[in-house]
């Protein structure tokens, strides 16, 4: 993979350009530090505000000898990471036409507003719907982000202070079911042989039939999933008792999709003739063949910060449990696939994968395996001793 990556870098004429949007409360440069620094090894990265500017994502080429010009892309892909404020119709139109002219988009969207910040000072908080004015646009392209939260017994651990030992706080770790560990939902090269991806307050995504648009599931929850509607009470008191596996029965909820093909414009049959016929805008009602990835978790690209010194940590690394999840690998694969196709991804995905144990089965059969691992060696030693004594006695009786 490294050899192919070097050859690819040397042979291409210029680095592909990635735009990361600002202006709608998205994750900032510090929160995306490790993600962007890693991207900079292969791409040019710009933080941009759309702000109603028609030429921020596309531009017109120089006229040819017949006076005709084309719409060109300023960026090979656009990343939208956890917006918190609504998109106005101008910005939606600019994104729509960027897509229509062949642009690629990585959406990381939270349909439900929920945060651990509120649980720092209280035992509970409420997850509520957030209106970003993007539902109609994403629905037009073929997906529907559901207003729910996914709880999964196969989840990341959360450190909770439970007391003090020798004047130092005692931290115990509990599985926080609102932080599912997502697994590959298909054999697509983007997620093949991938480590679990840590999600935070993630939602499910449904698809809508759109002619000419092919959909591939990328990430899903485990077989022990529960769906909570909104408003959702999120309380730390749930950690005081064991979960009832019977209510975690909504297996394999999809949280990320790849959409490829020719998309219909949200603004088809909605724009006045002076706009649709404008050469400056170059309005298109159907896209060129292109692709997008939609993830129902806005925090997937956010890195943690060191507790004492405050510097950004590698994306996917959890400093509390000292585990590294597959967030960085997945998002780099996503960008690479959108920009360059699956050539390099197919090579990189041949790396070995760390297989996570099924936490629910481990807990339910803990005593069985403890007894097995404790008693079996003792039983084998006793049997070996008895067999040795019998053989020795038999030999000497002759």
Describe each PLM feature range.
Residues 1-398:
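Short, surface-exposed patches at the edges or C-terminal ends of soluble domains, predominantly
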């Amino acid at each position: 993979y490294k050899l192919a990556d070097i050859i690819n870098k040397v042979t291409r004429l210029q680095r592909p350009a990635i735009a990361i949007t600002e202006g709608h409360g998205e994750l900032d440069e510090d929160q995306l530090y490790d993600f962007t620094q890693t991207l900079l090894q292969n791409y040019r990265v710009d933080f941009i505000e759309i702000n109603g500017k028609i030429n921020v994502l596309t531009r017109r080429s120089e006229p040819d000898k017949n006076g005709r010009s084309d719409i060109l892309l300023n960026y090979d892909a656009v990343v939208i990471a956890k917006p918190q404020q609504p998109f106005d119709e101008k910005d939606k139109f600019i994104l729509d036409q960027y897509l229509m002219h062949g642009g690629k988009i990585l959406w990381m969207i939270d349909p439900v507003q929920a945060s651990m910040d509120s649980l720092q000072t209280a035992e509970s908080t409420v997850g509520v719907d957030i209106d970003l004015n993007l539902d109609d646009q994403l629905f037009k392209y073929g997906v529907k982000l559901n207003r729910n939260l996914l709880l999964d017994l196969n989840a990341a651990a959360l450190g909770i202070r439970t007391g003090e030992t020798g004047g130092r706080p005692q931290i115990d770790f509990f599985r926080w079911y609102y932080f599912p560990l997502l697994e590959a939902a298909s054999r697509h090269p983007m997620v093949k042989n991938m480590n679990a991806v840590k999600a935070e307050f993630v939602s499910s995504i449904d698809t809508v039939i759109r002619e000419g648009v092919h959909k591939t599931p990328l990430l899903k929850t485990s077989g022990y999933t529960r769906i909570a509607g909104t408003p959702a009470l999120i309380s730390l008191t749930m950690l005081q008792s064991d979960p009832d596996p019977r209510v975690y029965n909504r297996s394999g909820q999809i949280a990320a999709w790849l959409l490829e093909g020719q998309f219909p414009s949200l603004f088809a049959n909605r724009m006045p003739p002076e706009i649709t016929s404008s050469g400056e805008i170059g309005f298109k009602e159907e896209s060129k063949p292109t692709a997008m990835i939609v993830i129902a978790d806005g925090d997937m690209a956010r890195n943690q910060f060191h507790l004492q010194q405050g510097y950004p940590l590698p994306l996917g690394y959890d400093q509390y449990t000292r585990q590294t999840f597959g967030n960085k690998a997945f998002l780099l694969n996503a960008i690479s696939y959108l920009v360059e196709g699956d050539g390099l991804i197919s090579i990189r995905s041949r790396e070995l994968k760390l297989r996570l144990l099924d936490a629910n089965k481990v807990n339910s059969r803990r005593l069985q395996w403890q007894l097995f691992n404790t008693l079996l060696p003792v039983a084998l030693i006793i049997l070996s001793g008895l067999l040795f004594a019998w053989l020795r006695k038999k030999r000497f009786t002759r």
